[in-house]
Amino acid sequence: MIGYHCLSANGQVKLHADTLQCHIVSFSAGLLFPGTGTHSQGLSGGNMRDLYGTPYLDFALEWSYKQQNGWLAGLDADIWIGMNGDNLTNRVERMGSVFYPGETSMAVNGEDGVVTAYNRALALRPGVGKIIRLLPKNPNSGLLLKLSGGWFMQKTIFHQDFNHPQVYQLSGDYAKLYDHLRNGVMLTESVGFLFMSNYSTYANFKITFDFSQCWSWSSRPWQIDNIMGLNGKDRGRYFDLMYGIRLTWMFPFTGKTTYDYYYY
């Protein structure tokens, strides 16, 4: 709780702000940029930066608990999606049996199907952080350092326009041959600024720069990708670097602000 103690009998006012110990629920939005990546067997064209156009949109829901000494512990749940909505790269070269020049698809009766292909990823990461106080009159704000890590999953989503003929090669289980489904673990280091208002429950935010290392592997028994030379089990391991920036709106559960008045 933030307390304000006012002594006003002789016209003097004294303000005192306390450090908070509270639960915080947060919502964030940001951008992710994949960096260089590697494949353990030397295959090229399969890392995140190669597969999908950038940047990605990153939306997250976060719960955290803040101690009075500035330490935080919490859990982040993220979803990433392609910013442009149709960002699978080189689809004709990757999936020559499905797409042909013009990036249209062969559907039933030889007609053209309309398919949107984009990436989607989910992540769940517990983490710990520390607020380093910078503002003398606000001990709950300052430089934020955070380390988190956990599980993530990414795949290609094929969305078909149902006003056009359907492409059976990308329907149901057949789509799994091309979707690059991968599971893995990731580690994220974050640095930024966190602000918690002395006056409002709603004027609380943080802006952070995130640096992530991702290790993943294919979760499908069979994958087809002509650029990677895949027509079978992908037995390799992937390593990707990710860079991001995000803005977070925080809602601390602190109760009502109290005012104490003394008359003498």
Model-assigned labels for residue ranges:
Residues 66-70, 80, 133-135, 196-202, ...:
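Outer-membrane beta-barrel channels and translocator barrels
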Residues 9-68, 72, 248-252, 264:
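Short glycine/proline- and aromatic-enriched beta-strand/turn motifs that initiate or cap beta-hairpins
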Residues 25-33, 63, 75-81, 145-153, ...:
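Transmembrane beta-barrel strands of outer-membrane/channel proteins
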Residues 18-27, 69-75, 122, 139-145, ...:
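Outer-envelope beta-barrel architecture signal
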Residues 58-60, 121, 125-127, 188-190, ...:
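Membrane-embedded beta-strand positions in outer-membrane beta-barrel channels/transporters
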Residues 189-264:
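Predominantly the C-terminal beta-signal and adjacent terminal strand-loop region
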Residues 1-9:
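Hydrophobic h-region of N-terminal signal peptides that target proteins for export
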Residues 36-52, 82-121, 154-184, 218-226, ...:
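Extracellular/periplasm-exposed beta-strand and loop segments of Gram-negative cell-envelope proteins
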